[in-house]
Regions:
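Short catalytic/metal-binding and nucleic-acid-binding patches
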Residues: 1-150
């Protein structure tokens, strides 16, 4: 609980603000290595974009965590948006993998992108995660990433 409180300290939720979010699977289990689970999570990311909760700029779904760069929409706060994502994706994942009691760890890390920061540079950092983790030799070889500029 104290860990969760520290995650929330200083959190500011501003519609139209870009955020880099990192959220992990429960117990850092490699559940997203399962193609069915990865597709379920990616489907919810797409629906949240289509439904106007946010505007996705880039994301990389790793085996045990998600990096996501988006601009927050007008519909809800950052915390409410992430709660919707985690609950919706959790339901979809458990439909594919009923053996998973929990999908996500509590909380998430967020970085509000400053005006002087380059969204494309952050997107490059995000999509290079599979390279740095040794999961692929070329970004294009890793299936679970997106960047609107590529």
């Amino acid at each position: 609980m104290a860990e969760q409180h520290r995650l929330r300290l200083g959190r500011v939720s501003i519609p139209g603000q870009a955020y880099h979010i990192i959220t992990a699977s429960h117990g850092r289990a490699p559940v997203f290595a399962d193609i069915r689970v990865a597709r379920a999570v990616i489907g919810v990311i797409g629906r949240m974009h289509q439904d106007g909760w946010l505007h996705s700029h880039a994301w990389a779904l790793m085996s045990d965590h998600l990096h996501w760069l988006f601009t927050l929409g007008e519909r809800a706060s950052l915390s409410a948006t992430m709660n919707r994502f985690k609950s919706g994706s959790g339901r979809q994942v458990r439909a594919e993998r009923p053996d998973l009691a929990r999908v996500w760890q509590d909380g998430f890390f967020d970085h509000g992108v400053r005006r002087d920061e380059d969204l494309r540079a952050i997107a490059r950092y995000i999509i290079a995660n599979p390279l740095r983790a040794g999961l692929c030799v070329n970004v294009g070889d890793y299936p679970w990433w997106y960047a609107e500029w590529l």
